[in-house]
């Protein structure tokens, strides 16, 4: 696939400018108020590139290496699940195994869905934060090496986000540098907690990780694996339906109230599932910050001042909800996502975006791929 520059004044094929421009007239109020990227990477036929920011690959070798340790006992999505949910999940993993691990099947599905490039990342449970740090590093390297191999084999269809052992910050920082500088990965996937410890837990010292991520200018994709205190969410798949967005909400709130976003401005953190509940229930945080001193112990500005710096995928399953997300945070902060290949994913991401009311075509193009291309440096 060849890309052609669309920056005004540049007719040079293969020369891609991902510049920010002043907000144009029309479009959502939030987008007009803050400005957004005006250029969009296009293919040879002039169609705007479509990039999926939220999709998973299961590394079977890594899973086999740790199978004797019974990883599921550490996974909230399994630990807090009814017997029926476990049976349904086992069947899903069996039925969707080719989609999870066979690239040719994946590419056929991408073509069917109208996706040009996936920013493929590990299956969310394959962070393995519960392992001993040395083993965690070994497995992370296996996963990252395979992702790099996929990108090298199909460079026109994939970029990759790796994984690092956050249970040991020194190893995590070193592996992050290797991912970016040696393997060419565009970022990493993390969970909203480290085996139950918050990302702001002083014992983890993850400010070093966030500082390195900012220095390298890479994407952090923060994906949950169920809620860690899911005793009340075992039936009806609630530890996914409610637990996944809840864990994202809790993890993001700690990053905001704990000052991570204030100490590391410019972090590029993408939140799946449209940001959990924060994308639509943000006003309560701001009220608490104004009303209570214990909400102002670290941050100096209202929580939404920091929330607006995050990026959100489009997985809302409803055009009006997606419209509200865009209105609040701006089209520049929203990226097409599918959660491929899981059953809770969006099967028609392009159709969902096209059905959003009152959304100008230029903003649709940015959401479908322009924003992701800018963040992931596709076309550079």
Where are these regions (language model features)?
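A general structural motif
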Residues: 249-252, 291-296, 314-318
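Short acidic/glycine-rich loop or secondary-structure boundary segments that cap or lie
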Residues: 60, 230, 278-282, 287, ...
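Catalytic metal-binding/acid-base residues of hydrolase active sites
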Residues: 56, 225-226, 275, 341
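Active-site gating/metal-coordination segments in enzymes
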Residues: 116-258
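Hydrophobic faces of well-ordered beta-strands that scaffold small-molecule active sites
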Residues: 51-55, 118-120, 159-162, 188-190, ...
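Mid-to-C-terminal alpha-helical segments outside catalytic/metal-binding sites
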Residues: 1-49, 53, 61-117, 145-153, ...
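Aromatic- and acidic-residue-enriched segments that line the glycan-binding/catalytic groove
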Residues: 62-75, 134-137, 172, 176, ...
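Aromatic-lined glycan-binding groove of carbohydrate-active enzymes
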Residues: 259-307
């Amino acid at each position: 696939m060849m890309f052609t520059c669309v920056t005004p004044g540049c007719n040079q094929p293969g020369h891609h400018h991902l510049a920010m421009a002043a907000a144009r007239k029309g479009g959502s109020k939030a987008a007009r108020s803050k400005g957004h990227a005006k250029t969009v990477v296009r293919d040879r036929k002039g169609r705007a590139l479509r990039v999926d920011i939220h999709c998973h690959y299961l590394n079977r070798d890594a899973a086999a290496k740790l199978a004797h340790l019974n990883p599921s006992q550490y996974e909230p999505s399994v630990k807090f699940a009814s017997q029926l949910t476990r049976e349904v999940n086992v069947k899903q993993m069996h039925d969707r195994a080719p989609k999870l691990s066979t690239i040719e099947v994946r590419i056929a599905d991408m073509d069917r869905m109208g996706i040009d490039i996936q920013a493929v990342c590990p299956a969310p449970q394959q962070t393995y934060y519960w392992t001993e740090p040395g083993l965690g590093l070994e497995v992370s390297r296996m996963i990252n090496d395979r992702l790099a191999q996929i990108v090298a084999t199909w460079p026109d269809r994939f970029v990759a986000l790796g994984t690092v052992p956050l249970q040991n910050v020194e190893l995590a920082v070193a592996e992050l540098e290797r991912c970016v500088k040696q393997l060419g990965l565009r970022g990493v996937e993390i969970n909203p907690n480290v085996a139950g410890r918050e990302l702001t837990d002083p014992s983890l010292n993850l400010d070093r990780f966030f500082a390195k991520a900012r220095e390298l200018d890479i994407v952090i994709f923060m994906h949950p694996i169920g809620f860690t205190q899911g005793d009340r969410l075992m039936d009806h798949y609630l530890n996914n339906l409610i637990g996944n967005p809840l864990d994202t909400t809790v993890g993001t709130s700690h990053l905001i109230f704990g000052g991570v976003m204030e100490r590391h401005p410019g972090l590029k953190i993408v939140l799946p599932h449209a940001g959990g509940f924060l994308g639509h229930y943000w006003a309560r945080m701001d009220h608490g910050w104004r009303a209570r001193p214990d909400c102002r112990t670290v941050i100096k500005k209202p929580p939404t001042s920091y929330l607006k710096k995050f990026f959100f995928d489009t997985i809302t399953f409803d055009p009006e909800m997606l419209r509200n997300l865009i209105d609040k945070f701006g089209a520049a902060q929203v990226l097409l996502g599918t959660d491929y290949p899981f059953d809770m994913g969006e099967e028609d991401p392009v159709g969902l975006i096209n059905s959003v009311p009152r959304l100008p075509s230029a903003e649709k193009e940015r959401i479908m791929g322009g924003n992701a291309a800018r963040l992931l440096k596709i076309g550079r």
